[in-house]
Amino acid sequence: MNRLKEKYVKEVVPALMSKFNYKSIMQVPKIEKIVINMGVGDAVQNPKALDSAVEELTLIAGQRPVVTRAKKSIAGFRLRQGMPIGAKVTLRGERMYEFLDKLISVSLPRVRDFRGVSKKAFDGRGNYTLGIKEQLIFPEIDYDKVNKVRGMDIVIVTTANTDEEARELLALLGMPFQK
């Protein structure tokens, strides 16, 4: 069993049970999935940019991403409906815990001037969104092979009903929130 999953079962669940007075163990919020999304706007002019983004996401997530396409045409961006414009990957189960563990313990501390992640990035339904400015914070990415620094969005979807419960869940799992 994954290190983070073990921590969740042994420490986080009992702590949340006592803090929020849940009657059943099934009420305790858990992480449902993690979605990593990388928008590649320059794929319109340069289709090869998308291939490198897909490759990088595959290395980061450990599974192949889905290429996302434009929903509608925008003339100002020279964009046609259905053009490939980004990549996303949805992680569940073991891979999700492995990725979260790696994100918390290895990648986030590698961010320059890192002071913790924002406490305000919850959406009101218990989901947390985290923006990353560069893909170089992940140890799998080789600095010399990167042709362009790209950011990504990481959405952590939980079963929590309120932001407070989700914040407590992530904090107990080791998410470095700002003081």
Curated annotation (Swiss-Prot):
UniProt-listed Pfam families: Ribosomal_L5, Ribosomal_L5_C
PROSITE patterns: RIBOSOMAL_L5
NCBIfam families: PRK00010.1
Record-linked InterPro entries: Ribosomal_uL5, Ribosomal_uL5_bac-type, Ribosomal_uL5_C, Ribosomal_uL5_CS, Ribosomal_uL5_dom_sf, Ribosomal_uL5_N
Subunit: Contacts the P site tRNA. Forms a bridge to the 30S subunit in the 70S ribosome. Part of the 50S ribosomal subunit. Part of the 5S rRNA/L5/L18 subcomplex; in this organism only 2 proteins, L5 and L18 have been shown to be part of the 5S rRNA subcomplex, unlike E.coli and T.thermophilus where L25 (TL5) is also found. Has been shown to bind 5S rRNA.
Function of the molecule: This is one of the proteins that bind and probably mediate the attachment of the 5S RNA into the large ribosomal subunit, where it forms part of the central protuberance. In the 70S ribosome it contacts protein S13 of the 30S subunit (bridge B1b), connecting the 2 subunits; this bridge is implicated in subunit movement. Contacts the P site tRNA; the 5S rRNA and some of its associated proteins might help stabilize positioning of ribosome-bound tRNAs.
Gene3D superfamilies registered for this protein in UniProt: 3.30.1440.10
Any one Gene Ontology molecular-function term assigned to this protein's record: structural constituent of ribosome
Protein name: Large ribosomal subunit protein uL5
Effect of substituting residue 37 to A: A 25-fold decrease in binding of the 5S rRNA
Family: Belongs to the universal ribosomal protein uL5 family.
UniProt KW keywords: Ribonucleoprotein, Ribosomal protein, RNA-binding, rRNA-binding, tRNA-binding
This protein's GO CC annotations: ribonucleoprotein complex; ribosome
GO process terms (BP): translation
Taxonomic source organism: Geobacillus stearothermophilus (Bacillus stearothermophilus)
